[in-house]
Amino acid sequence: MRGGAGAAEAPAAAGAATAAEAEAPPAAVEAWALRVAGWAPHDATRARLEAGLQQEERERVRKFRFEIDRHRALAGRVLIRTMVAEALRVDPAEIELKRTEMGKPFVARPDPGTFSFNLSHHGDWVVLMGHPSRAVGVDIMKYEQPKGTQSLEEFFTTMRNSFTPDEWGRIRLGATGNAVGAPHLRRFYKYWSLKEAYLKAIGIGIGFGLQRASFTLDEESGIAMLDLDGARDTQFTFRLSQLDDEHCVSVAVEHHAADGDAAPRIAWRRLAGIEVKDEEGVVLVDSK
């Protein structure tokens, strides 16, 4: 939020921090969650939202086969531009997004590298995280049996090699033989979302050996620890929480030396909807 005009102050010497800056806590990581279940924008609303995107973004949204996936993707792209515009204090139209060789989107204009963000959408929710200087990763999962699988047992057999023996033992805790049920599926998705959040934070996808990363999760507190290649990793802070009874969300936030033993702050914000405005900035539709 822009501050109002106030009394003028003498500028600090170049390279010196003011007392307020020295005492101010590090900026919190922004985390926005938008529930999109049941959102079916009219053609005019969708066209208005798409008009604010780059051509490459519009093409990515339209490539999704199912309408609900297109709606989630569209909402996510709009949220990205809204968050970046607020953080950099620019008009969304001034923002240009590009992708790394590994496919991770980043802000290319107006100020390259000034804001890190990551988006996830699955089930009923879209979640976006962002911070000016910390790498971030987020992944949301809905607790449901994947489409196209005949049984949970078949699904678990297919995914077994994505986890370390320790992780797999915790996921299958209490299982008898090959039989698995809803509690095991929930734990599966919790560990899976942690791995995904980490990979998204470091900007690597295909080619990373998932068994290199072994997570230990305290389900009560949501605090997770990562052992990477057999050694405790301290580069990132990991947290898992519930958006509702059917969805979990994992976040990975880069840890800075100045943080000491404190975990980076995460400021969660549940959005009521997406505002669609005309040329004069008048709200036409609250599209939630």
From Swiss-Prot:
Reactions the enzyme catalyzes: apo-[ACP] + CoA = holo-[ACP] + adenosine 3',5'-bisphosphate + H(+)
Top-level taxon: Eukaryota
Entry keywords, A to Z: Cytoplasm, Magnesium, Metal-binding, Transferase
Compartments where located: Cytoplasm, Cytosol
Uses: Polyunsaturated fatty acids may be beneficial in prevention of cardiovascular disease and treatment of mild Alzheimer's disease.
GO cellular component assignments: cytosol
Binding site for Mg(2+): D139, E196
One MF annotation (Gene Ontology) recorded for this entry: magnesium ion binding
Gene3D superfamilies documented for this protein: 4'-phosphopantetheinyl transferase domain
Reported function: Phosphopantetheinyl transferase that is essential for attaching phosphopantetheine to ACP domains of the polyunsaturated fatty acid (PUFA) synthase converting the inactive apo-synthase to the active holo-synthase.
Subunit note: Monomer.
PANTHER family hit by this protein: L-AMINOADIPATE-SEMIALDEHYDE DEHYDROGENASE-PHOSPHOPANTETHEINYL TRANSFERASE, PHOSPHOPANTETHEINE TRANSFERASE
Entry protein name: Phosphopantetheinyl transferase
UniProt source species: Thraustochytrium sp. (strain ATCC 26185 / S-3)
Lineage, top ranks: Eukaryota, Sar, Stramenopiles, Bigyra, Labyrinthulomycetes
